[in-house]
Amino acid sequence: MAERVATVSRDTHETQIQVHVNLDGQGHFQCETGVAFLDHMLDQVARHGLIDLDIHAKGDLHIDDHHTVEDLGITLGQAVAQAIGDKRGIRRYGHAYVPLDEALSRVVVDFSGRPGLSMDVEFTRASIGRFDTQLFWEFFQGFVNHAQVTLHIDNLKGFNAHHQAETIFKAFGRALRMAVEPDPRMAGRMPSTKGSL
């Protein structure tokens, strides 16, 4: 299988972002976004997804974190889509349940070519530190629109908002890892009866 790596840049009046992704990595992570809690969550994606991520971002954080978080989702989605190519030989579907103490989340992903986000999460706090929990939806919406995936995120249990978020991102990483894995039984074929995704 060809090397599955991509580097994508996004440069707007609001943000300047570069994302490098290696889908067949070791979980190496380097990130400077200015949004510390999101950096912590993206570290979980890299580590549990065994995806190498190198992310650099500058955004209009003097306004708030919204543009930076949304644009990071967009750029990461573009990088994953570019790295995965035409999707021949991948498992396509991935899912994971992840607990952290009292919290439990489930994430299911389909590299369907059809962007869609279903996110059933009621955070117990409006913010985690200074991070607005509404921005998680913006991040994932940006990701699905540009990775062209269907993504279901459900927080099943939890009263600690940090734990809720961490289980979501760990499960997201593990679901991605499963979905993008080469399936030896597919032998390079397209995982769809349509013949394309």
From Swiss-Prot:
NCBIfam families: PRK00951.1-1 (NF002106), PRK00951.1-5 (NF002109), PRK00951.2-1 (NF002111), PRK00951.2-4 (NF002114). Its main location: cytoplasm. This is Imidazoleglycerol-phosphate dehydratase. The keyword Coiled coil does not apply. Pathway: Amino-acid biosynthesis; L-histidine biosynthesis; L-histidine from 5-phospho-alpha-D-ribose 1-diphosphate: step 6/9. The gene is hisB. GO terms for cellular component: cytoplasm. Transmembrane segments: none annotated. It comes from Chromohalobacter salexigens (strain ATCC BAA-138 / DSM 3043 / CIP 106854 / NCIMB 13768 / 1H11). PROSITE patterns: IGP_DEHYDRATASE_1 (PS00954), IGP_DEHYDRATASE_2 (PS00955).
